[in-house]
């Protein structure tokens, strides 16, 4: 594993990321969140009062959640001011109410929340235990959790194959970012070990398609 910078602050990188079409993956994340918010009986559970999106970036997940749950408080947190500005502009354009905060995981102070999500955050972290500790700390009783991220291939040849398959015609900055992110990502086994150390026994790890993993479940 080769870690990459924790924050995306370079203007060219921020603009390229914000302009990229991640709608397919974003929708899969939103669909999983919707399913997670249903009770065991299949009936829709009550809407979460407070939703926390960690590493929210330009709002790809936060903004649809704010639209889907207009009575909920949606809090988007990111350490990059440039990313948050994109999210603010989009929220204004869409007329959405959302609480956007610039903070690192280390400095984040919040009251307990009812739903914690992140999309492509984990691989940025040099200390992944921060995410799991914060998840446990901020989870209200019965909090639902969903973290979706890339998973690291076993060999560099597989990194190249995935790049050719999924972003062969992307801008150079996105190709570089995609490859660096794959190499920086964790394996499902590593994430399972992280969850065990954090005492998050109610969360499970599963693989999604050819390059993602999903951590989800309930925190009692």
Language-model regions: role of each:
Residues 1-16:
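N-terminal, positively charged/glycine-rich alpha-helical extensions of SAM-dependent methyltransferases
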Residues 23-47:
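Conserved alpha-helix/loop element of class I SAM-dependent methyltransferases that forms part
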Residues 47-57:
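Conserved class I S-adenosyl-L-methionine
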Residues 125-135:
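A short, conserved alpha-helix within the catalytic core of class I
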